[in-house]
Regions:
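An extended, acidic, His-containing surface patch that forms the Zn2+-binding/catalytic region
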Residues: 67, 74, 209, 229-232, ...
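Fold-level recognition of mixed alpha/beta catalytic cores in primary-metabolism enzymes, strongest
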Residues: 106, 111-112, 116-222, 370-389, ...
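Acidic/His- and Gly-rich active-site-bordering loop/insert found
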Residues: 2-109, 130-135, 355, 365, ...
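Generic non-transmembrane alpha-helical segments
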Residues: 18-21, 25, 40, 44-48, ...
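Midchain, well-structured core segments that form catalytic/ion-binding scaffolds
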Residues: 154-292, 298-300, 304-305
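Acidic-glycine-rich active-site phosphate/pyrophosphate-binding loop
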Residues: 86-102, 166, 181-192, 359
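Short glycine/proline-enriched loop/turn "hinge" motifs that connect secondary-structure elements
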Residues: 12, 89, 133-134, 180-186, ...
Length: 405
C-alpha cells in the first residue's frame, strides 16, 4: 500500500533538520520579517518541481501558497501555518536562533510556535512528491505571515482575496494534540495619555502622563467585573489584562506621554459582544475624564478576532480524530464549543471569512509558545507527520490508483 510506504519513510532526522533550518531563520513579528523564511519555503518546493505562489498584502511580507492538484479537485484539503514568531526576548540558556537538540527536544524560538508544525507539512509534502502519490482531490499548503499580530496581512488576506479555497483544513498550531474547534475573541485596547513635558520642579502645575495612566488603569481594574460581566456556558470567563505600559524618558523629566495596551478575551458562548465591551470600557474612561482635572487620553480599539466555534460534526473532525487515534492510541480531546481555548489563531480567518472548517491541531505544548527556552518534543513531530499522512490518504488519495514504486 502507498500509505505504508510513505509512513515507513517518515524520518525523525529529517524532521529535526527541517525544524532547525526554519528556526535558524529569524522571522520576528514585530516588526514583521518573514521574507527570508518565505524564500526558504519557496525554494524547498521549487527544488521539487513545483511552482509556489508568492503573494503580499504588505511589501516584504510574502505568503507562500502551494497547490498540488488532484484528478477531481474535490475535496480540497488545506494544511497551513504561520511563518512569523514573537521576538526572542531575554532569559534564554542558548542562542534562540541557533537551535540545539537536548533530551529528545529541539530548543529555539519558534520550535513550538510553530516552525515544528511547518516542518511536518514540508516533510509530508516531500514524501508525497517523492513517492508520486496520485491525488483524487487537491492539497493546498499555505504558509502565512503576521499571525502574531492578528493575521490581517497573512491568513486574512489570502482568504479575503480567495487565494486559498478548500473544503477542510488543519492548522498546525501547538495544541499538544488537542483538537480545537472554538477560540475566544480578542480585543486589544491601546491607551495614550498626554501631559506636559517639563522639569520635575514644575510638578505642581504640570500634567503627568504616567500618573494619569496609573489612575486610569486602577479604575479599570476596579471596574473589571462591570466591563466583562456576561452570561456564558461552561467555566470560560472573559479576561481583561493590562500587558504593556510605556512612558517617560528620564528620572528628572515629567513625562508628556504614556501608552498602555490591554488584552481582552471573550469566550464564544458568551453574550458579551466586542461592541458592548468597547462601550463599557469607554464609559469608564468617560467617568475618569470627569474625575481627573486635565486628563487627555486617546483610546484605540482593535478587534483582532471575534469569538467563534465550528461544528463538531464537520468532516475533518472525524477524519482527524480517527487518524490521531491510529497513531496515538487514543482519541484526541476535542475543545469546543465549550470550553474554548484561550488562544487565538488563523483558524479565525479560515473559518469566519472563508467558511473553511479548520481544526487547530498540532505538535507542542502551548505553554512553550512565546517562552524563553521554547522547545518541542521530537516524538511529537514524528507523530504529527504520521497523522497528517493518514489524513491525506483518508481524504484525497484514491487507494485504487496507488501503485508501489
Amino acid at each position: 500500500m502507498g500509505l505504508d510506504k510513505v509512513l515507513a519513510d517518515i524520518s525523525e532526522d529529517r524532521l529535526v533538520t527541517l525544524t532547525k533550518d526554519l528556526v535558524a531563520i529569524p522571522s520576528e513579528n514585530p516588526p514583521g520579517n518573514e521574507n527570508a523564511i518565505a524564500r526558504y519555503i519557496a525554494e524547498f518546493f521549487e527544488g521539487r518541481g513545483m511552482r509556489p505562489a508568492i503573494t503580499e498584502k504588505t511589501p516584504g511580507r510574502p505568503n507562500v501558497i502551494v497547490h498540488l492538484q488532484g484528478v477531481s479537485k474535490k475535496p480540497t484539503l488545506l494544511l497551513t501555518g504561520h511563518t512569523d514568531v514573537v521576538p526572542a526576548g531575554a532569559g534564554w540558556n542558548t542562542d534562540p536562533y541557533q537551535p540545539v537538540v537536548k533530551d529528545s527536544k529541539i530548543y529555539g524560538r519558534g520550535t513550538c510556535d510553530m516552525k515544528g508544525g511547518l516542518a511536518c507539512i514540508l516533510h509530508v509534502m516531500e514524501l508525497l512528491l517523492k513517492h508520486n502519490i496520485p491525488l483524487s482531490g487537491d492539497l493546498v499548503c499555505a504558509f502565512t505571515v503576521a499571525e502574531e499580530t492578528g493575521g490581517a496581512e497573512g491568513a486574512g488576506y489570502v482568504v479575503e482575496e480567495r487565494l486559498v479555497q478548500a473544503d477542510m483544513g488543519i492548522l498546525l498550531e501547538p495544541s499538544d494534540f488537542q483538537l480545537v474547534l472554538a477560540e475566544e475573541g480578542v480585543l486589544w485596547v491601546r491607551l495614550t495619555t498626554h501631559g506636559t513635558t517639563t522639569h520635575t520642579l514644575n510638578a505642581a502645575t504640570a500634567c503627568n502622563a504616567v500618573e494619569h495612566m496609573t489612575t486610569i488603569l486602577a479604575a479599570l481594574m476596579k471596574q473589571r467585573s462591570s466591563i466583562l460581566g456576561c452570561n456564558h456556558r461552561g467555566n470560560d470567563e472573559p479576561i481583561l489584562s493590562v500587558n504593556t505600559v510605556q512612558g517617560g524618558d528620564k528620572p528628572n523629566v515629567i513625562p508628556g506621554e504614556c501608552q498602555a495596551t490591554i488584552d481582552i478575551r471573550i469566550p464564544p458562548e458568551c453574550d458579551l459582544t466586542m461592541e458592548s465591551a468597547q462601550a463599557r470600557f469607554s464609559d469608564v474612561l468617560t467617568r475618569q475624564k470627569g474625575d481627573i482635572p486635565g486628563l487627555d487620553v486617546d483610546v484605540q480599539f482593535d478587534i483582532i478576532a471575534r469569538p467563534f466555534h465550528q461544528p463538531r460534526d464537520a468532516e475533518i473532525v472525524g477524519i482527524l480524530a480517527g487518524c490521531a487515534k491510529e497513531v496515538l492510541g487514543v482519541y484526541p480531546e476535542i475543545v469546543g464549543p465549550v470550553p474554548s481555548t484561550d488562544e487565538d489563531s488563523d483558524a479565525y480567518h479560515f473559518w469566519t471569512k472563508g467558511q473553511i472548517p479548520t481544526v487547530y491541531f498540532g505538535p507542542g505544548k502551548i505553554e512553550q509558545a512565546h517562552a524563553a527556552n521554547e522547545h518541542i518534543e521530537i516524538l511529537q513531530l514524528v507523530q504529527t507527520a504520521q497523522i497528517l499522512t493518514r489524513v491525506v490518504f483518508d481524504t484525497i488519495v484514491d487507494s485504487s490508483t496507488v501503485r508501489e514504486n
